[in-house]
Amino acid sequence: MEYAAEEHSNMFLESRDSEGRPIRWSATHRARQRLRHRGRIIATWREALLASGNNTPGLRVVGAIGPLLDQWVDRGWGGLSFRMTQVMTGHGNFGHFLGRIGREQDSRYHHCSAGDDTAQHTLGECPAWADEREALVRLLGRDLSLPAVITAILEEERSWHAFASFCEKVISQKEAA
């Protein structure tokens, strides 16, 4: 929001003459200015995300979305559900996260013999979710790393919905267990 506020302020100032009176811009010029400022907002945001280093909360998501920020912002479909956000960030019903915040004794997995219950294990490996995953793989392909998933869900709306469906089904079952 801070980047948008700064660019809106810059656009306002550019639309005034030296005495503060409004400059009459054509609709085409105004639209070009908005696009230019929007591009600067996204570029500034991307730079800040990528420069934030390894101390950034959500580093996994920043690494996956950062290079595709334009496409992420411009996608014409899909909002993030609570459960999609959990899978993307790893913050949610995962032993690794719950152990780290003191909600569970350790990070073990409750649905298979894996030693560490992470979002990536749930998304790409756990045999407990093989049926749910197969529908996802048919649309997105075998690479279910977060960067590959983000790329796929930004390419097609049906891929977005498949990922959303996987997250809803699997996380709701994990919550019920």
Give, region by region, the residue ranges found by the protein language model.
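Acidic catalytic cores of enzymes that act on phosphate-bearing nucleotides/polynucleotides
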Residues: 1-88
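Family-specific functional microsites
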Residues: 68, 72-177
